[in-house]
Amino acid sequence: MGIEEGATKVSRQFTATCFRMEQRPATAAGTITLGGDLTVNRMGFGAMRLTGEGIWGPPDDRAEAIRVLRRAVELGVNFIDTADSYGPHVAEEIIAEALHPYPDGLVIATKGGFERPGPGKWATNGRPDYLRRQLEGSLRRLRLDRIDLYQLHRIDPKVPANEQFDALRGFQREGLVRHVGLSEVTGAEVERARGVVPIVSVQNRYNVSDRQWDEVVELCEREGLAFIPWFPLSAGDLDEAGPLARIARRRRASVYQVALAWLLARSPVMLVIPGTSSVAHLEQNIAAAELRLSADDLAELAAVV
């Protein structure tokens, strides 16, 4: 059974209770401000799953993908994360189809820096000319004049890092990009980039049992940057005898909801972006914004690593 399919009857009951209490449950996560001028709810949405298998091609059900995006906004989501490479291009096109003209306050973040040779295949490309083509394509597909948050998907080891950072700074000066973020970077790389271009966010893999980027979370806290965790649940966390499952049973929630609630509790700079291609799973994910873990719950999860 996959992560999204693991929601139990009790988790659906928890979700329904949250929706009776708060018709825009994403707001319960609180807010974070990016770059001093973009305030968003800390429960966002990640668009990677709005594509085909291997993050390639169109989704099996495009109409459902559109419903997911519209429902996310109805539930209070005002931060959507995507990338040129999701599809490629597919997720950005669906976002525009579903939501343009965009509601006031909706922030769309996208990323560049990958080529897609085929399904499930990724190759870094941080050449400035390639990044420019990707950015121009994203602007066109999203029907925007400026990207609110443009993230370097990976630092390309084949291209001097400062050339990549310089390109991002140039896009910002041209008015094509409002703010800049990084993905899968060390603390030292964040600091190096900040010497070239203002950085407002970091998107790294992070979850209850994979906390290798704790030092980056702490850096983000010190410097007022958003930390956007991807892959919020590892396969091992689904163990029915594990702490996440025990807490989920006590809380009448799903393991996935507990994992998301832990991330939100981990740090005030966390901006979570759970993704799905199903409206039902979307509602379960967003309901996690209402889930408050106790001190005992958090202590139990602190012992996972």
Name these PLM-found stretches.
Residues 14-31, 155-305:
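Beta/alpha (TIM)-barrel catalytic core signal, keyed to glycine-rich beta->alpha loops juxtaposed to Asp/Glu
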Residues 139-158:
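Active-site groove signature of glycoside hydrolases
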Residues 58-72, 126-142, 186-192:
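Short, acidic/polar
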Residues 35, 96-107, 140-143, 194-196, ...:
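Acidic (Asp/Glu)-rich catalytic clusters
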